[in-house]
Amino acid sequence: MALTNFSLPFGALGQPWGVTIAPLHPIHQLASNTNNLLYSPADHQQQTPAEAAADPEYFKNNPYAPPQSGGYQYQNTAGRRKQSNAYLPPTAPNAVRNSVYHIQQVQQTQQQQTQQQHQQQDQHENSVSFQSSSSRSSSSSTTGQSSIQLTQTHASGRGPAEGSYSRYPGQQAQPPQQQQPQQKQYFNAHGSASATFTKNSGSFSITSFGSRQQQQQPPQPQQPPPSQQQQPPPAPPPQRSRQAKPEAQPAQTYGVAPPENYPERAPGFTRVQAGQGSRTQVHAVLDYDVEEGEEDEEEDGEEEGQFYEGQENDKSNNNQMPTVTPIQGPIYLKNGTVPVVPLFSYPKLNNGSFLQIPIWWTALSVALGLDVRGDVIKGVPCIKRYHQLFCPTAGNSYPIDKIERFIDDNKALMRRMYGDFEMNMEGPGGGGGRQQGKVRKRRFIDEPDIFIPPGAFAANAGETVEAGDSYFGQLRKKRQAAAGGSRNRGGSAGGSGNGNTNANRQPGNKNGSSGTGRLDACESKIEIVTPYWASNSAGKIRAIVNTQHFEQAIHQEVCSNTQTPRCEGECGCEQKYKWHRLLAYDPDNDCKGIFMDWFLFPSCCVCRCNP
């Protein structure tokens, strides 16, 4: 049905008010805005002709009644009680809901009692503020309501989002002994900040919660039959004085200060259906409730200094209402309707390499049984020992692909550098020994080549190397003599990853003797290693060429002890070093390719004495 002019009562206020309201007054704007409110089809009922002809004095602000010639005169109920809340009463078991849409039929006798009650209240009131836009409250301790009013309930019966749109609703100014019989009041309060109504007991609201029947005083069993006339409430009241009772403040919704009391009731929901010729506006509201026990945790967090970013520590706010946590991060709609807001961010602990490297090296040394008495070198899996790098493996940074590509592109150069050549050595016995032609030779520490100065190796060549024999042949004979078995020729060079072959030389042992019959005074350990990384004469780390087809090995002797029974007292065993020329590759400069470079490795162990 079509709605009549809702602002009719507001334009014809009677003389008892003594106020002339302009057409553009906020009261009229509120009345025009409330014309677009929705009325539930289940709650809305047509008026009957008998009810339409009822006393106009009773149907004061009836928008469905025919227009009257003059405005209705409001009763000057200046002595009405100031109530703390403006909500609807709970529904009695034998009556229908008492809301703005279901008003109660009041008999003539009840109207007379109401008028008498107003006259008694006028004697107890001291002053009356401006009430042109305020709501009418008429109540009886034993009967229902005589005018179109909302019902007041106690603050404990409010929902989480219920509340009037008035910042300072009416407060009770009477003593407690007078509040008990007047607990059930029918009060109507509407906010001036919005064009919608909040509700309790089934009233309409944009953010609506279901009715809940909670009241300190039980409802009166005598309830008159409901009226089918639907009358909207009067205009909102102006600002009233705020009473310092925290439990008397209603919950707030849009742009109104939060109250000081939070109810302990679960929210309900009421479905709002639009009527004919009306509009619907739905606003999403994020409400975060503080549960019991969380306030103590927040206080502990304040002492420890644990706060979210952007959240201020306000201890002066002792508000009982839950504070809305600031939104952190994007809003995700679950199932397209429910907003999910991430409110917590958990700190993460990132372990840096400074913690992982020592643990990794310790585990590696224990697993491989390595002697890690040295400095760890950054970038390569090596440690520095005996003034040189000791690398058990090549590691991931070894440029094996670049080395093999260079070898494939420069095979002739590699043969000349690495080479196939004939070695013809003459011993002291003279006489042109056997020649071994076209044998690929590997460069080692004691192998003579064209770079050895004249006389550096020929002086003792006849004592250690026979004509036409290689260094590994002599080394193989020494190992066979020490181990008492036979091995294949060249087996000591190998091609394994570590490439280490150890042999101990002890004083008095046969393998420590020379052609002169003298023995080594210091114990030493012979190692044949195939290095992957080494430090050159300039202190730069270079990759040593050791691939499947091109292998380079180093023969070295490492001192086992600092003193021996034959080297003690003022004497001691010292480690000696020697320079080696090896094929190397610069991992930082691919343009250099493979080149020859000098590297220092341990050579032997000698016993030295003080002068």
UniProtKB/Swiss-Prot annotation:
Comp. bias intervals (Pro residues): 218-239
SUPFAM superfamilies, alphabetized = Cystine-knot cytokines
Signal sequence segment = 1-14
Any one cellular component term from GO for this entry?
extracellular region
Here the segments flagged for biased composition (Polar residues) are: 191-210
**Gene3D superfamilies assigned to the protein according to its UniProt record, in alphabetical order:** Cystine-knot cytokines (2.10.90.10)
> In what ranges is there compositional bias, type Low complexity?
104-120, 127-153, 169-185
Provide the protein name: Protein spaetzle 3
Comp. bias intervals (Acidic residues) = 288-306
Q: Name one Pfam family in it.
A: Spaetzle
Task: Give the positions annotated as glycosylation sites.
Answer: N5, N335, N351, N511
Q: Add the further remark from the entry.
A: 'Spaetzle' means 'noodles' in German.
Function of the protein = Neurotrophin which may function as a ligand to the Toll-related receptor Tollo. Involved in a Tollo and JNK signaling pathway that positively regulates neuromuscular junction (NMJ) growth in presynaptic motorneurons. May function by activating Tollo to promote the phosphorylation of JNK.
In alphabetical order, the GO MF annotations are: growth factor activity; Toll binding
User: Between which residues do disulfide bridges form?
Assistant: C522-C573, C559-C605, C567-C607
PANTHER family listed in its UniProt record: NEUROTROPHIN 1-RELATED, PROTEIN SPAETZLE 3
**Which residue ranges does the record assign to the Spaetzle domain?**
521-609
Asked if the keyword Glycoprotein belongs to this entry, the reply reads yes
Biased composition annotated in UniProt, kind: Gly residues = 487-498
Recorded source organism is: Drosophila melanogaster (Fruit fly)
Q: How does it assemble?
A: Homodimer; disulfide-linked.
Q: Which InterPro entries match?
A: Cystine-knot_cytokine, Spaetzle, Spz/Toll_ligand-like
Q: What does the UniProt keyword field contain?
A: Disulfide bond, Glycoprotein, Signal
Q: One biological process GO term for this chain?
A: central nervous system formation
